[in-house]
């Protein structure tokens, strides 16, 4: 009789432990990885916003080229960290670049796209509106 009880205990203990572990890992929220320090990109976009708010859209277009170059160079390091967040920023970047590079850029559209890009740079998990 003791041997049967011992056998049941030796079987039940690992089963309970493994089951508990499986339940815990399946209900624990997935941890997302950030993109690291994006402050240098925010600084450049703040400069672009300042130029655009002063009406210097040509200067803003030149300055956003610095952003584009830095963003493209950092892609291989940043993109693998979090594809979703990177894509959100990249889409907002493309929209801002397009707005500034139109033959006759609209100051209002440029302002809105730059604000959206700055918002996404501050919170990459949220796509631009």
Describe the role of every protein-language-model region:
Residues 1-4:
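Positively charged n-region of N-terminal signal peptides that target proteins for export
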Residues 7-18:
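Hydrophobic membrane-insertion alpha-helices, especially the h-region
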Residues 24-129:
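Mature extracytoplasmic or organellar-lumen-exposed domains after removal of signal/transit peptides
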